[in-house]
UniProtKB/Swiss-Prot annotation:
Name this polypeptide is given: Uracil phosphoribosyltransferase
Pathway the protein acts in: Pyrimidine metabolism; UMP biosynthesis via salvage pathway; UMP from uracil: step 1/1
Protein residues bound to uracil: I193, G198, D199, A200
Binding site for 5-phospho-alpha-D-ribose 1-diphosphate: R78, R103, D130, P131, M132, L133, A134, T135, G136, G137, S138, D199
Length: 208
């Protein structure tokens, strides 16, 4: 499976705090931001670098910069917005694209009700953010939309993933790497990740 579980002590510690049943909205939201920041560091580890000259205090020197078009971060509405600030803290120049999905009542598959992409998607790396990767339907649909725009370099950043969701993404898009803080046990009969985080969107927005 093309999945990278970020097994860092700080990531594990903060994720456990999020799993607590009495985790407040403020605490959950803050931890989601902190985790997204830490995890984005790992997800950006293979960004391509190019050399260029700068004027330093002692004269001209050679330095490094990230090559190519700026990353676009793609939160899946609404829960993905809870991770956006953390990624932007690390990569403040990132461009933001947004995808909103809802379930078709007949096919039960996710369909887009809102999408807004930045320009030159075919030249940018994309980082999809969503707290939960459960069935994988929303993630697969979002990747479909990005590839339809010509995007070739796509990664997914999720706080918690279920094996079923990882398999769905890998089957549909084996070229996409998933970064997660935890690969949990399974989905229950209602489609919730076990042990998971509960309804991350409700907890982030205080609507539980």
């Amino acid at each position: 499976m093309n999945v990278n579980v970020i097994n860092h002590p700080l990531v594990r510690h903060k994720l456990t705090l999020m799993r607590e049943a009495d985790c407040s909205t403020y605490k959950f939201r803050t931890l989601a931001t902190e985790l997204a920041r830490l995890m984005a560091y790992e997800a950006s580890r293979d960004f391509e670098i190019e050399k260029y000259l700068i004027d330093g205090w002692c004269g001209q020197i050679e330095g490094d910069r990230i090559k190519g078009k700026t990353l676009t971060v793609v939160p899946i509405l609404r829960a993905g917005l809870g991770m956006l600030d953390g990624v932007l803290d690390l990569i403040p120049t990132a461009k933001i694209s947004v995808v909103g999905l809802q379930r078709d009542e007949e096919t039960l598959k996710p369909v887009s009700y809102f999408e807004k992409f930045v320009d030159s998607m075919d030249e940018r790396p994309a980082l999809i953010i969503d707290p939960m990767l459960a069935t994988g339907g929303s993630m697969v649909a979002t990747i479909d939309l990005l590839k339809a725009k010509g995007c070739k370099n796509i990664k997914a950043l999720v706080l918690v993933a279920a094996p079923e969701g990882v398999k769905a993404v890998n089957d549909a898009h084996p070229d996409v790497t998933i970064y997660t803080a935890a690969l949990d046990s399974h989905l229950n009969e209602n489609g919730y990740i076990i042990p998971g985080l509960g309804d991350a969107g409700d907890k982030i927005f205080g609507t539980r």
